[in-house]
């Protein structure tokens, strides 16, 4: 405002230059002296080379360290910190004068100053009105970014009455016209036109930031604030980034409130008829000026930088860091500890116990999650296709098996982890939502959980409770590690380089050992194949285990500090993770051959059907083995994947692929007392009772003579895999008969068909009798306990009107229409 058009009259000029800000002008002079005189540790002028950089057309901001300013002049630094918004334009003029002295600068080029290395950091909750105008540094997570727009900073207006140019009208965060024409003989106050060619514009971007989960007080809703970025600061952060913003808190008019139609007092007086009622009319003195009090707090940032890894930020996944740069960030003591950890022979076990000190047992799950935190090496092919390095883990188990505890531990430990519940999450909440900006009414992308966890871990609890349409939304994020959005005119592909740690409950609440993993979990095949590791936690009754768990829980409740036995502290593990993740191990020839050999074993075993896998073995399992091997190599700070790393990766993968051991089926368990009525349901679960318990169960029923007789002869048992094979054969035959002849088979016909099918395997009459007995018991079990087959019976009516089932010796059999045949 101090640049005045010379054509204006003396009176008008005197009116604009009445007040001089002496403090700000003194700051300008001292700041220019600082830029010209301050010397670095090497004795050279520190900011001279930076000033020469400003000659380039794309550069307009000088970055100044606040620590240097404090060393040079403590009083100047204090004044700038307390009165930043007031002196900021004068500091920018000092930069302009400094740049002019060191190069040929265009006349109309604008310059800005940005400060870094502020000593104190504030939370969003601490941004209150007493801090308005002072220099602050805040740390938060970006949740929404708006497109970059040009912003009118200083306008030149043309008076439409006398054609006088009114220059340098400062814009107060909304379109601001001159209050009156500067021509003394012209009284125009309203009719002005903006001359865009002579006005000054600057790049402008609006960003919404939100408190991080770690800073949030328990049970509170995260606070958010809008940040305004200008000039070189635009496009310096993306949704999901955790950044430090340096700038000042300012108050701006709430444009969305000001632009609400039909509520301004002056417009309502001109509206008549029905529309007048909608506009509410003038409401008297009570409503006068209410719209002019609509202001909001906004943070005007001059500098943005990603959160320093020393304080937690991109700590786990700073891929472009070298060992040397990480070493320089640590103190000597910290570095010695990291080196000592890398030499630890028992590192694998010690890291597991340090990460999950309050969870007893479940060592395999701990190892899998630990390798997930180290991660594999992301790769890119020559065609530009990226191969993910992140490891996805799913934990399936009965209630109270510490599934959610694992997720919570990872969320607290990992600096960039997002915890969400599957039931309460939608597809847009997990990936990204397209929302309308309340001011510009444009559509902008708001980050979801996977975007916020970019370069981190996304913990999803109750994964099986998610709707199918919401599960489909994360297919792309789990394999390609991107999120594609095409909605509301916005087409974008966003990064979601995140590991997914999911917890799911089995169908029906408890894991049924008699069924495969696919039948136990309510997940689609594509989702299951995208998980590298599946861990099954079964709540078994074991006296030794139960005692150990109970002892552990009681210890934790009574002596919390003493009972937690950590080998390394959480900060030490974090530092070690940061250091180990910069290794990019290569696969040696020996290891490559070993991986191929193990994969062939898995495929052959899957095809043979002898030890049936929990799900299909595909190339994804081969990639999983490679990623896990790289994670093991990283953990041991090795530049090469060795066969011992592959061996551990194969062992972990094998644990999750092999189906949970199922006990043999006892075909004699209820033979002596066939259920005459269907109320006897207590025996349905006997197939799942481990060996050695059947005698006790049968003895409870009160049939003492029969149970003694049963104890005398050995019970007829059948391998579970063989039982399923016979069951599938019978179901296929019955369905085939129904489809071809549209008739059902009697029980005896089905038994004869089966015996004929296996006649080549029968050598003696004794074996024939034995096989016939087995098939009879299998059909009996399929009808009465598994409910896979249904007996068709005739009904007769008595005179009383009651139905009585006529028991047939050889009933017709049909397959239960709800039964789905396993692959």
From Swiss-Prot:
Residues 347-554 form the MCM domain. GO terms for biological process: DNA replication; DNA replication initiation; double-strand break repair via break-induced replication; mitotic DNA replication; regulation of DNA-templated DNA replication initiation. ATP binds at residues 397-404. It comes from the Eukaryota. Its EC number is 3.6.4.12. A motif (Arginine finger) lies at residues 529-532. It holds the Pfam family MCM. SMART domains: MCM. A zinc finger (C4-type) spans 159-186. One of its GO terms (molecular function) is single-stranded 3'-5' DNA helicase activity. It is an enzyme of class 3 (hydrolase). Its main location: nucleus. SUPFAM superfamilies: Nucleic acid-binding proteins, P-loop containing nucleoside triphosphate hydrolases. The keyword Transmembrane does not apply. Residues 667-680 have a biased composition (Acidic residues). It is found in: Nucleus. Residues 663-710 are annotated as: Disordered. Keywords: ATP-binding, Cell cycle, DNA replication, DNA-binding, Helicase, Hydrolase, Metal-binding, Nucleotide-binding, Nucleus, Zinc, Zinc-finger. Belongs to the MCM family. Acts as a component of the mcm2-7 complex (mcm complex) which is the putative replicative helicase essential for 'once per cell cycle' DNA replication initiation and elongation in eukaryotic cells. The active ATPase sites in the mcm2-7 ring are formed through the interaction surfaces of two neighboring subunits such that a critical structure of a conserved arginine finger motif is provided in trans relative to the ATP-binding site of the Walker A box of the adjacent subunit. The six ATPase active sites, however, are likely to contribute differentially to the complex helicase activity. Component of the mcm2-7 complex (RLF-M). The complex forms a toroidal hexameric ring with the proposed subunit order mcm2-mcm6-mcm4-mcm7-mcm3-mcm5 (By simililarity). Begins to associate with zmcm3, mcm4 and mcm7 into mcm complexes at the neurula stage. May replace mmcm6 in the complex that functions during licensing of DNA replication. This is Zygotic DNA replication licensing factor mcm6-A. It comes from Xenopus laevis. The lineage of its organism: Eukaryota, Metazoa, Chordata, Craniata, Vertebrata. The gene is zmcm6-a.
């Amino acid at each position: 405002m101090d640049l005045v058009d010379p054509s204006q009259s003396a009176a008008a000029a005197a009116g604009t230059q009445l007040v001089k800000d002496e403090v700000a002008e003194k700051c300008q002079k001292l700041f220019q002296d600082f830029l010209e005189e301050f010397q670095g540790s090497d004795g050279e002028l520190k900011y001279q080379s930076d000033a020469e950089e400003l000659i380039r057309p794309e550069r307009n901001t000088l970055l100044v360290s606040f620590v240097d300013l404090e060393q040079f002049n403590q009083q100047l630094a204090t004044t700038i910190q307390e009165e930043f918004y007031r002196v900021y334009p004068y500091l920018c003029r000092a930069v302009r004068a400094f740049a002019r002295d060191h190069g040929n600068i265009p006349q109309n080029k604008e310059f800005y100053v940005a400060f870094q290395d502020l000593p104190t950091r504030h939370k969003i909750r601490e941004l209150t009105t007493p801090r308005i105008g002072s220099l602050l540094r805040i740390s938060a997570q970006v949740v929404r970014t708006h497109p970059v727009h040009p912003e009118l900073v200083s306008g030149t207006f043309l008076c439409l009455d006398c054609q006088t140019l009114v220059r340098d009208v400062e814009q107060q965060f909304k379109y601001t016209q001159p209050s009156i024409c500067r021509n003394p003989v012209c009284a125009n106050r309203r009719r002005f036109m903006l001359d865009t060619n002579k006005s000054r514009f600057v790049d402008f971007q609006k960003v919404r930031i939100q408190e991080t989960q770690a800073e949030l007080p328990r049970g509170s809703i995260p606070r958010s604030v809008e940040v305004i970025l200008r000039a070189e600061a635009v496009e310096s952060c993306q949704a999901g980034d955790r950044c430090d913003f340096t700038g000042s808190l300012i108050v701006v008019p709430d444009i969305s409130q000001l632009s609400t139609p039909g509520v301004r007092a002056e417009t309502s007086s001109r509206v008549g008829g029905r529309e007048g009622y909608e506009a509410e009319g003038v409401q008297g003195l009570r409503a006068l000026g209410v719209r002019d009090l609509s202001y909001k707090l906004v943070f005007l940032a001059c500098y943005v930088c990603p959160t320093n890894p020393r304080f937690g930020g991109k700590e786990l996944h700073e891929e472009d860091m070298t060992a040397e740069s990480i070493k320089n960030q640590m103190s000597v003591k910290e570095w010695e500890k990291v080196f000592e950890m890398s030499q630890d022979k028992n590192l694998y076990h010690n890291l597991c116990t340090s990460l999950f000190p309050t969870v007893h047992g479940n060592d395999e799950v701990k190892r899998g999650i630990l390798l997930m935190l180290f991660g594999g090496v992301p790769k890119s092919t020559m065609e530009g296709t990226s191969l993910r390095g992140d490891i996805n883990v799913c934990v399936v188990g009965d209630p109270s098996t510490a599934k959610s505890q694992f997720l919570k531990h990872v969320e607290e430990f990992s600096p960039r982890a997002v915890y969400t519940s599957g039931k309460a999450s939608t597809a847009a909440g997990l990936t990204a939502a397209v929302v309308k900006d309340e001011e510009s009414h444009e559509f902008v992308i708001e980050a979801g959980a996977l975007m916020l966890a970019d370069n981190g871990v996304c913990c999803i609890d109750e994964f099986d409770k998610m709707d199918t349409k919401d599960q489909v939304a994360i297919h792309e994020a789990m394999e390609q590690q991107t999120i594609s959005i095409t909605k509301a005119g916005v087409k974008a592909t966003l990064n979601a380089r995140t590991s997914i740690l999911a917890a799911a409950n089995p169908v029906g609440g408890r894991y049924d050992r008699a069924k495969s993993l696919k039948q136990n979990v309510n997940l689609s095949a594509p989702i299951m194949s995208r998980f590298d590791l599946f861990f099954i936690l079964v709540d078994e009754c074991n006296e030794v285990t139960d005692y150990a768990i109970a002892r552990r829980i009681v210890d934790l409740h009574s002596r919390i500090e003493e009972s937690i036995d950590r080998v390394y502290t959480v900060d030490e593990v974090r530092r070690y993770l940061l250091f180990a993740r910069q290794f990019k191990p290569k696969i040696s020839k020996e290891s490559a051959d070993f991986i191929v050999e193990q994969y062939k074993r898995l495929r052959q075993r899957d095809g043979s059907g002898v030890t049936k896998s929990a799900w299909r073995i595909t190339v994804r399992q081969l990639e999983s083995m490679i990623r896990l091997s790289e994670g093991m190599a990283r953990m041991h700070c090795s530049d090469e994947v060795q066969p011992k790393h592959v061996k551990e990766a194969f062992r972990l993968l094998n644990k999750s692929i092999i189906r949970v051991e199922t006990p043999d089926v006892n075909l004699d368990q209820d033979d002596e007392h066939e259920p005459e009525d269907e109320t006897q349901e207590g025996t349905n679960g006997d197939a799942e009772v481990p060996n050695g318990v059947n005698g006790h169960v049968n003895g409870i029923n009160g049939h003492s003579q029969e149970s003694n007789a049963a104890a005398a002869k050995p019970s007829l048992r059948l391998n579970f895999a063989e039982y399923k094979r016979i069951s599938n054969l019978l179901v296929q035959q019955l369905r085939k008969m129904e489809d071809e002849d549209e008739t059902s088979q009697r029980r005896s016909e089905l038994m004869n068909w089966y015996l004929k099918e296996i006649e080549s395997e029968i050598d003696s009459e004794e074996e024939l009798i034995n096989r016939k007995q087995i098939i009879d018991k299998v059909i009996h079990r399929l009808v009465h306990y598994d409910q896979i087959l249904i007996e068709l019976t005739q009904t007769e009516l008595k005179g009383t009107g009651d139905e009585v089932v006529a028991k047939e010796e050889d009933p017709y059999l049909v397959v239960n229409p709800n039964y789905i045949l396993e692959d």
